[in-house]
């Protein structure tokens, strides 16, 4: 046997030598010179003969039938080993190959990475195409650079590669990796440059099928040069991935902030309701406390009657039991004292009763707050998972409008049977919230396995398999409450092995049910057993009242009923997918006579394959019980509020209120004393019933109206002072009472203890029922100036940090024995000391909460970098911080350390990321040395002003939410050139001034502040990078109508507003609503201030204005000149409300009427609509009655703009003056309407003071009867460049002095003769008319208008008049001699004074020259023609010059 093996080995070595060109006979001599051997495709079944090659460095064995690695012990120099495409099942036999650098074991049957610990020089390791399930055994391979694990069964990465920091190339293609979180583990490989997860040669990893796969990898691994065999070294690719990731982070940060805001709003509603509920008990407590203190004063005075002062040694309240007993022994007026004591006892009982009610309300409030937080607490983690998975995990909160919501709702109701829950007092179920979860990762697994079942079955059975899909409730372990973390793990990762229920009989499977009772009753039973000793039934219901259901999609597959005696496991049911148990066989089933058949259908299933149970819906529900749940919004509590005031007899507290009245009316009934407003010497002595100040040791000023304690400095012996129920806001006046031991300042309005000092002997202090807020400041004052204090009461004050107040006070005031009436135990004092010790920044706290990481980890998270870094890598308390170590600290997270101030950070010069959230900080001090800060978080403190950070020029993120901020220092943000996120939510900020230069700002969260004025938005208009703005909860939302559109219009770059993405339709609506709108905000923005009262002129031309909305109008009362030329106004809009406007210029607009026109009537035809717009068209004209109606309606409208005198409406396209409603401008003096489309002068009858009317360049042909029907004050009328042919209807213009008729179509001289009715006319133009071709018009007009001083731009003098008379007389004479006329000639002197008939000349021929200008009906002699021709030529030259000089009139200013 041995000989055959040796013979076989010899043949193998011969084959080895043959394949590598070596001589078998000489191998003993030549073997030492061989460094490389190769064996391909059979002939080498075992590794043998390598001892012959001691210097071998490379060995390649491919496609051999080798089953194990052996025989390599002699190969001490081996550096490269290939054993590929063999049958190797285990990595072994390599321990001696310590110089190995490259190892190729691909295409084998290896299932585990092992025995590589000693190969520390290994650089390349290929284990692809094996059956490896886990990455392990690589910890010692520090030099590994190339690792190929493709084509295996690996589903997780974990931290197994953390030690391989030199790794440059990694191939994990063809595995079962399905989670993005697994890929983030690769971020700890700093040298990784080539990563392959989706190599085309292998099957696809499930993770590669997810959305945003490439983006996720490239963002987390920015140093990659090649990814999935592609070159990704281009800078643009990395920038795109970074930009996408940044947008995702911003988006989810916005959504999380929106959720937090909604939670805060809900909690504020609860708090408001609590305050309303507490109002009645508080009023009762105050009333009884007042009466009680009044009686105590009476009792003290009664005991001290006959004495000059009361016993100052009695510092305890007289209502203490010991005092009451001692008082009973007093013999002086025993009956009165007994009555007082009896009434005091009754009052104490009532105070206790109402205090108990206050405590009950507080308890219910805390229960509801806890429930609200629990309900909201699931949403934020879901959003974080959604961010981490880059949207592959998505959830949606349902509403009644969603079909899937209604489906789930009906499913729950259909599977609830009241019979099953009757024993627990449950009558129904109320669904509060349904969350739909879409986990793409789990869904792919589910669909993949489901598809395999379908493929393995015949087509005929596929439909039956689909019917095996069910929606079932997951059955949680009843003995373990549903923790948020556990539920989130199921939703994100599915039902893993660790999630299987370990129930009796070792039932190992995912348990689901189609019955609510099967899912829930075990939990209810367990909770009842656990708390069976509780006495209150309502409390028992509260244990299980709220619950969570997880609805899953389940593929039951082949399902059989469970056998009674066999445990439910896959081994007992090998051929099935699930096992079910009907309800009647369940051990905990409560069976009995039932009125329904629900139990027949109720089953519990056990599903073996976890991937076939897909979580889809999370349902939050509440059981409806016979005992109603205590709620701040219950009917009972509302009755407390309303009915107690309106109808005490019906109120639920009616008996208590009656009892209160009876107690108040008990004897003795103390008469009210007159209230003191001020204090003087006489009053003090009178109250103390003594004449010597030094004798006064007790002074009771209870129940007055005092706000100051003057003249108390003389009371040097005062030991006891009661100033309760007064009007004090501070206690400055008691600082000099050095002997004071007892001070009662309750029920006042004290807001600060500043000035409260020097009371070293004070032992009892009552500050309850005041307005103290700043716990840190007030505790400091008490600590410094009340060193002997024993009892302190600070209840019922609006403290800023009430949760830690008690520990803070006890820890600082070490002499205290009682706080708020409760004894301070040693344990509580010790806990308080530890608490105070932790409120200071020490070296130990720096070590525990800091990190030295140089770069922020690339993690998709919205949490502050300081929080992330200190969780990833802390320094640890065991280290010692030297001076150099301080400089290494880059991140510091001191959240929730109850700090009162920031100290000891002077050496942290390189600090980049810091967080001090949820502390007691009141100032931003102690950060002066941290000028390299990039992120600073100060949420949840008591800071009132942003200061001291102007030098932090590298700051990129600043968050100061939930503080008391009212503003910031000037120029705080001017130098922050990298600031892109600013969050100032839930503060008291009133202005955004100071943010104008924050040009890099991308996100601004400033919800729930006090911003009220629209102008504040203009401070953000220059921030072109701002894409997310949250202004929710500010006053501007209610002050500004259409607030959302207002902000969108003014900040067009925004992508999201108030947590809601901006839709394109909203942008369009904003432009329609606010585009071209002149508002006070726009004016304030341009002026830089909003003091509009100083404005006298408003000049806003060429700004696309469509409407004017200047509010408040009273602010613009001094504006007298308005110029809005070249805009898009269609009416006067808001200008009509400006009270003192005198000059209004609206040229080049689209004015249709003074007031906005109503929409056209729908019943009008298209032709009628055309006539409304262009009356000259003649289409659709409705007759005179319509015009008359317009005139009547215009005349009946009330006048407006009483101060307006000058109006410019040129070039507006006006065609109808009646629709313009100019009659309402009764005081108008100058009206300019040039360049329009006016065809009729009408609708101006009421303008009785109008002096100048300009209608040049219009379409006027003639004047109708109503044009100038009434006598007018018009002095100048401009009608140039129209279409006038007639000049009638001007007789009412009795005061007209200037008339401009140039460039019309007047061709009949008889029309000019009609002007002689205007005897006042001084200036006239008619050039450019056809009549001007006949030179007779000038002489005729000069002759007929005796007052004319200017004609066609030329002055008219006496010579012109003489020439006119001469030429006209000569013309008349020649006419009489040449032409027979039908009328007798007139006396030449009467030409121009008396209207004469027109000249008629017939049958006269002009051969040439001038005659053609006069028309065919006039013929002149050659002499007359020669004279008139020369004159006409001169006149043409003159008129051309005048026309060039003549332009349309400008507005008088």
Swiss-Prot record:
Pfam families listed in its UniProt record: LRR_4, LRR_8, LRR_9
Keywords: Leucine-rich repeat, Repeat
Record-linked SMART domains: LRR_BAC, LRR_SD22, LRR_TYP
Disulphides: none
One term under GO cellular component: cytoplasm
InterPro entries registered for this protein in UniProt: Leu-rich_rpt, Leu-rich_rpt_4, Leu-rich_rpt_typical-subtyp, LRR_dom_sf, SDS22/Internalin_LRR
Annotated LRR repeat ranges: 53-78, 97-119, 120-141, 142-164, 166-188, 224-248, 264-287, 344-367, 671-693, 694-715, 716-737, 739-758, 759-784, 786-812, 886-908, 909-930, 931-952, 953-975, 976-1001, 1023-1048, 1092-1115, 1116-1138, 1139-1161, 1201-1224, 1225-1247, 1248-1270, 1272-1292, 1293-1317, 1319-1345, 1365-1388
Stretches the record annotates as Disordered: 302-321
Gene3D superfamilies (alphabetical): Ribonuclease Inhibitor
Name of protein: Leucine-rich repeat-containing protein 9
């Amino acid at each position: 046997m041995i000989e055959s093996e040796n013979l076989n080995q010899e043949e193998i070595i011969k084959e080895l030598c043959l394949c590598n060109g070596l001589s078998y006979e000489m191998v003993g001599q030549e073997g030492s010179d061989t460094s490389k051997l190769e064996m391909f495709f059979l002939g080498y079944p075992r590794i043998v003969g390598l001892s012959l090659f001691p210097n071998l460095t490379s060995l390649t064995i491919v496609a051999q039938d080798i089953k194990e690695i052996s025989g390599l012990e002699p190969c001490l120099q081996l550096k490269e080993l290939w054993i590929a495409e063999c049958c190797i099942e285990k990595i072994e036999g390599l321990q001696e190959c310590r110089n190995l650098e490259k190892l190729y074991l691909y295409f084998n049957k290896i299932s585990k990475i092992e025995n590589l610990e000693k190969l520390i020089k290994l650089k390349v390791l290929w284990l692809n195409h094996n059956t490896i399930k886990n990455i392990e055994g690589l910890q010692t391979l520090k030099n590994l650079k190339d690792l190929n694990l493709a084509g295996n069964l690996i589903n997780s990465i974990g931290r197994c590669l953390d030690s391989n920091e030199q790794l440059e190339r990694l191939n994990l293609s063809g595995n079962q990796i399905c989670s993005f979180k697994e890929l983030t583990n690769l971020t700890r490989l700093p040298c990784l440059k080539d990563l392959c997860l989706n190599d085309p040669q292998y099957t696809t990893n499930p993770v590669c099928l997810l959305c945003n796969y490439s983006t996720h990898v490239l963002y987390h691994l920015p140093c990659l040069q090649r990814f999935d065999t592609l070159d990704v070294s281009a800078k643009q690719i990395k920038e795109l991935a970074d930009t996408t990731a940044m947008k995702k982070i911003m988006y989810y940060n916005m959504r999380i902030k929106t959720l937090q805001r909604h939670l805060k709003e809900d909690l504020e509603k609860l708090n408001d309701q609590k305050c309303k509920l507490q109002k009645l008990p508080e009023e009762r407590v105050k009333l009884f406390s007042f009466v009680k203190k009044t009686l105590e004063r009476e009792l003290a005075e009664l005991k001290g009657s006959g004495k000059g002062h009361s016993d100052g040694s009695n510092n305890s309240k007289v209502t203490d039991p010991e005092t009451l007993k001692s008082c009973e022994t007093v013999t002086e007026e025993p009956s009165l004292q007994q009555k007082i004591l009896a009434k005091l006892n009754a009052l104490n009982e009532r105070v206790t009763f109402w205090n108990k009610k206050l405590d009950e309300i507080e308890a219910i409030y805390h229960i509801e707050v806890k429930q609200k937080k629990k309900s909201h607490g699931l949403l934020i983690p879901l959003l974080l998972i959604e961010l981490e998975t880059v949207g592959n995990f998505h959830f949606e909160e349902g509403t009644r409008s969603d079909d899937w919501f209604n489906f789930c709702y009906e499913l729950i109701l259909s599977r609830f049977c009241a019979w099953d829950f009757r024993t627990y007092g449950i009558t129904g179920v109320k669904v509060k919230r349904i969350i739909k979860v879409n986990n793409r990762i789990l869904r792919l697994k589910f669909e993949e396995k489901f598809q395999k079942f379908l493929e393995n079955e015949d087509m005929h059975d596929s439909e039956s398999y689909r019917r095996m899909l069910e929606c079932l409730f997951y059955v949680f372990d009843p003995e373990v409450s549903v923790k948020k973390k556990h539920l989130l793990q199921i939703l994100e990762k599915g039902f893993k092995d660790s999630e299987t229920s370990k129930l009796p009989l070792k039932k190992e499977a995912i348990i689901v049910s189609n019955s609510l009772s099967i899912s829930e009753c075990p939990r209810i039973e367990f909770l009842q057993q656990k708390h069976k000793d509780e006495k209150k039934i309502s409390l028992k219901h509260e244990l299980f009242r709220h619950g969570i259901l997880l609805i899953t999609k389940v593929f039951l597959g082949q399902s059989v009923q469970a056998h009674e005696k066999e445990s439910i496991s896959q081994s007992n049911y090998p051929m099935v997918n699930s096992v079910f148990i009907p309800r009647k066989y369940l051990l905990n089933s409560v069976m009995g006579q039932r009125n329904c058949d629900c139990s027949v259908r109720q089953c519990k299933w056990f599903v073996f394959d976890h991937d076939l149970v897909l979580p889809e819906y999370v349902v939050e529900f509440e059981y409806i019980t016979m005992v109603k749940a205590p709620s701040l919004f219950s009917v009972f509590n509302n009755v407390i509020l309303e009915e107690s005031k309106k109808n005490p007899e019906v109120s639920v507290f009616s008996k208590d209120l009656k009892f209160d009245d009876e107690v108040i009316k008990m004897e003795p009934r103390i008469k009210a004393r007159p209230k003191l407003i001020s204090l003087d010497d006489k009053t003090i002595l009178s109250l103390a019933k003594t004449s010597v100040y030094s004798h006064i040791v007790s002074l009771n000023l209870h129940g007055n109206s005092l706000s100051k304690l003057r003249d108390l400095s003389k009371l040097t012996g005062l030991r006891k002072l009661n100033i309760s129920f007064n009007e004090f806001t501070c206690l400055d006046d008691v600082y000099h009472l050095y002997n004071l031991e007892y001070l009662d300042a309750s029920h006042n309005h004290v807001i600060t203890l500043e000035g409260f000092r020097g009371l070293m002997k004070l032992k009892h202090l009552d500050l309850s029922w005041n307005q103290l807020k700043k716990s840190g400041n007030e505790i400091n004052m008490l600590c410094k100036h009340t060193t002997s204090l024993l009892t302190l009461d600070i209840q019922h004050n609006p403290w800023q940090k009430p949760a830690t107040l008690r520990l803070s006070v006890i820890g600082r005031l070490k002499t205290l024995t009682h706080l708020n009436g409760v004894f301070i135990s040693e344990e509580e004092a010790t806990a308080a000391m530890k608490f105070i010790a932790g409120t200071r920044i020490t070296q130990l706290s720096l070590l525990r909460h800091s990190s030295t990481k140089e770069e922020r980890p690339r993690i998709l998270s919205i949490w502050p970098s300081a929080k992330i870094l200190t969780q990833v890598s802390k320094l640890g308390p065991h280290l010692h911080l030297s001076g150099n170590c301080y400089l290494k600290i880059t991140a510091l997270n001191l959240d929730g350390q109850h700090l009162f101030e920031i100290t000891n950070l002077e050496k942290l010069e390189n600090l980049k990321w810091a967080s001090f959230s949820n502390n007691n900080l009141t100032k931003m001090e102690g950060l002066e040395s941290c000028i390299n800060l990039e992120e600073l978080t100060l949420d949840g403190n008591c800071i009132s002003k942003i200061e001291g950070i102007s030098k932090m020029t590298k700051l990129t993120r600043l968050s100061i939410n939930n503080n008391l901020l009212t503003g910031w220092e000037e120029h705080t943000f001017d130098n922050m050139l990298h600031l892109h996120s600013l969050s100032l939510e839930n503060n008291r900020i009133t202005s955004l001034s100071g943010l104008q230069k924050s040009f890099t700002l991308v996100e601004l969260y400033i919800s729930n502040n006090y911003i009220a004025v629209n102008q504040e938005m203009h401070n953000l208009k220059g921030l072109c990078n701002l894409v997310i703005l949250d202004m929710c909860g500010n006053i501007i939302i209610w002050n500004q109508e259409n607030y959302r559109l207002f902000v969108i219009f003014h900040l067009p770059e925004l992508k999201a507003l108030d947590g809601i993405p901006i839709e394109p339709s909203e942008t369009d609506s904003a432009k329609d609503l606010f585009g071209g709108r002149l508002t006070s905000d726009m004016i304030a923005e341009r002026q830089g201030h909003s003091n509009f009262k100083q404005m006298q002129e408003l000049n806003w031309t060429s700004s696309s204005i469509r409407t004017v909305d200047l509010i408040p109008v009273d602010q613009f009362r001094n504006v007298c000149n308005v110029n809005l030329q070249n805009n898009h106004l269609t009416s006067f809009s808001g200008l009509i409300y400006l009270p003192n406007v005198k000059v209004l210029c609206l040229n080049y607009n689209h004015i249709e009427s003074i007031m906005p026109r109503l929409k056209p009537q729908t019943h009008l035809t298209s032709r009628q609509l055309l006539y409304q717009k262009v009356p000259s068209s003649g289409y659709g004209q409705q007759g005179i009655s319509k015009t008359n109606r317009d005139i009547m309606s215009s005349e009946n409208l009330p006048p407006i703009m009483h101060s307006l005198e000058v109006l410019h409406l040129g070039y507006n396209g006006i065609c109808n003056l009646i629709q313009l409603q100019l009659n309402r401008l009764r005081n108008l003096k100058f009206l300019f309407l040039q360049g329009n489309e006016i065809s009729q002068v009408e609708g101006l009858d009421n303008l009785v003071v109008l002096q100048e009317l300009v209608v040049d360049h219009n379409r006027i042909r003639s004047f109708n009867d109503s044009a100038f029907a009434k006598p007018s004050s018009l002095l100048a009328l401009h009608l140039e460049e129209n279409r006038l042919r007639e000049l009638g209807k001007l007789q009412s213009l009795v005061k007209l002095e200037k008339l401009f008729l140039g460039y019309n179509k007047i061709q009949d001289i008889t029309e000019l003769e009609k002007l002689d009715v205007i005897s006042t006319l001084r200036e006239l133009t008619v050039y450019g008319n056809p009549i001007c071709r006949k030179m007779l018009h000038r002489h005729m007009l000069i002759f007929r208008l005796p007052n004319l001083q200017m004609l066609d731009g030329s002055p008219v003098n006496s010579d012109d008049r003489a020439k006119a008379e001469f030429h006209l007389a000569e013309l008349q004479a020649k006419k009489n001699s040449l032409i027979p006329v039908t009328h007798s000639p007139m006396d030449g002197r009467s030409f121009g004074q008396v209207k004469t008939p027109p000249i008629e000349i017939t049958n006269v021929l002009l051969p040439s020259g001038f005659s053609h200008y006069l028309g065919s009906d006039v013929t002149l002699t050659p002499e007359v023609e020669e004279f008139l021709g020369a004159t006409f030529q001169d006149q043409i030259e003159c008129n051309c010059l005048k026309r060039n000089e003549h332009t349309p009139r400008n507005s008088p200013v």
